[in-house]
């Protein structure tokens, strides 16, 4: 093998080694993808009507100081709820989807509501921390599911 051929292969081999090393390094870190689903005028009604599913939805606007002060709370809640069956965490930007917010009677921000089988079942007004919100939605979801089961038995 000539010296010039060997020199041309060295940069290619180095680049390949760096790429593989980088991919291995990045795979060691957990993904921080949010489990929060953005709901829009096109998706809101169908999503909250999902059978036997509770939706905990945050209604906000980008310019609201109180919404901004939530920081990563909603994303953190979405991650905390990831393993819970039949509970979804969603958000609506009332600046973009005013029709949705008008339909569900949103007049202040942020507003947090729980929907079950398409019906509003609760409004959250408690502490703004992941554990309190998680406890609330788990309890409301359980009550709504029991009520739905009772209604089904009556039919």
Each predicted region: which residue ranges?
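Proteins that catalyze or organize thiol-disulfide redox chemistry
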Residues: 2-155
């Amino acid at each position: 093998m000539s010296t010039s051929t060997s020199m041309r292969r060295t940069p290619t081999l180095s680049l390949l080694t760096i790429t593989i090393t980088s991919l291995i390094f990045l795979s060691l870190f957990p993904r921080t993808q949010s489990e929060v689903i953005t709901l829009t005028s096109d998706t809101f009604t169908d999503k909250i009507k999902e059978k036997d599913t509770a939706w905990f939805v945050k209604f906000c606007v980008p310019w609201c100081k109180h919404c901004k002060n939530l920081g990563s709370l909603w994303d953190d809640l979405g991650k905390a709820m990831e393993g819970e069956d039949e509970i979804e965490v969603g958000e609506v930007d009332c600046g973009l989807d005013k029709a949705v917010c008008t339909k569900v009677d949103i007049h202040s921000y942020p507003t947090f509501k729980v929907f079950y089988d398409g019906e509003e079942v609760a409004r959250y007004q408690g502490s703004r921390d992941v554990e309190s919100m998680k406890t609330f939605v788990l309890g409301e979801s359980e009550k709504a599911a029991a009520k739905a089961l009772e209604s089904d038995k009556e039919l």
